[in-house]
Amino acid sequence: MAQLEGYCFSAALSCTFLVSCLLFSAFSRALREPYMDEIFHLPQAQRYCEGHFSLSQWDPMITTLPGLYLVSVGVVKPAIWIFAWSEHVVCSIGMLRFVNLLFSVGNFYLLYLLFHKVQPRNKAASSIQRVLSTLTLAVFPTLYFFNFLYYTEAGSMFFTLFAYLMCLYGNHKTSAFLGFCGFMFRQTNIIWAVFCAGNVIAQKLTEAWKTELQKKEDRLPPIKGPFAEFRKILQFLLAYSMSFKNLSMLFCLTWPYILLGFLFCAFVVVNGGIVIGDRSSHEACLHFPQLFYFFSFTLFFSFPHLLSPSKIKTFLSLVWKHGILFLVVTLVSVFLVWKFTYAHKYLLADNRHYTFYVWKRVFQRYAILKYLLVPAYIFAGWSIADSLKSKPIFWNLMFFICLFIVIVPQKLLEFRYFILPYVIYRLNITLPPTSRLVCELSCYAIVNFITFYIFLNKTFQWPNSQDIQRFMW
């Protein structure tokens, strides 16, 4: 059985890489020059490739750390000595873009290993489910698209997934180092290093909580009321955190992540903020509706798992049973949409992104719609939480805290910001039946075909520019 799974995995990886190479060739023919954010990333990488590492050579418009450029130089530069290629060829646009294609292969393998580690090993989880789940996430449209451009997404995903995998195997020093590498690709990845530490803490809390529940005589007095379970957990957390033995044990397990956290704090103090370069366009704010956008995004791409008649029926019965609670959550959500909805200047200034059309033709045209969608947001959020109910409550707590910290401060609505939390979520839901995975994979294939076709063939020009423009995520 294991041998068959190995054959299936190899076939899936080989076919995906073959298709990716064909798409890469099409991208290379269509895009001879840097496009979108590549106009910043590619010249900077080429300067590094030529050996110009001084700060005077840094483009101030770049807001991320140089992890992508350093890794790219480390990958392509040896080709000068191995294949006797010229520096012009090695540092070309095509070669630098190809680095992300290599990252995509690494991501495929890491996803497979993570599905093996995260999902409980039982007879119900067949080899075809694991391979199909890996293939599906590897071609997740928003992530897959950026494998063909010189963006930070593929490398950022690689080091974050690698850090998560090492954390699950208990190799926390390696995990923290890989978390640092992910931070060098995108500063907000520090939160996913915190998530790895939180994963360790959640595991220990879960063990202690199970011990607490198994006791015949509970030390805590019985609590009754609508929030009894919540208060009981809160009391447990307070009691647990008051124990020096527990805290010292957690410190011994998580000290590599704590050290990384101190390094991050030092960076923020020295740099004067988390953003480098052009900070005017990346100011943090409390953009609470970002959570609702993420819930909608996740519902759209995971609809085979999150949207079903039984799920809707269960949700409606809960609404009927807890009507007052639902009303309170709805009112709070409406208030957050009303007071904390922002439209970043880039959102409305660039008509090459799909988010531009979502905002302009939907939210901006029908102002009332953002309030009418609140019940759908609540359903999506509940459905996501319900799909993660197989995970311990403390794991869920850590995940949603990290999700909140990662996306809420972002003023710009950008689908790329949702990729990592979506992948972490998708890795941790119970392995779906094969039929749902086939449905999900088919939908991803259709979305990918449409987006690639539009990007490569449906070009346009701005009135004041002769450059060819393309639609993209």
From Swiss-Prot:
Keywords: Endoplasmic reticulum, Glycosyltransferase, Membrane, Transferase, Transmembrane, Transmembrane helix. Its EC number is 2.4.1.256. One of its GO terms (molecular function) is dolichyl pyrophosphate Glc2Man9GlcNAc2 alpha-1,2-glucosyltransferase activity. The chain crosses the membrane at residues 7-27, 65-85, 98-118, 127-147, 151-171, 176-196, 257-277, 284-304, 318-338, 366-386, 393-413, 437-457. It is found in: Endoplasmic reticulum membrane. Interacts with KCNH1; may regulate KCNH1, possibly by regulating its N-glycosylation. Interacts with KCNH2; may reduce KCNH2 sensitivity to classic proarrhythmic drug blockade, possibly by regulating its N-glycosylation. This is Dol-P-Glc:Glc(2)Man(9)GlcNAc(2)-PP-Dol alpha-1,2-glucosyltransferase. It comes from Homo sapiens (Human). The gene is ALG10B.
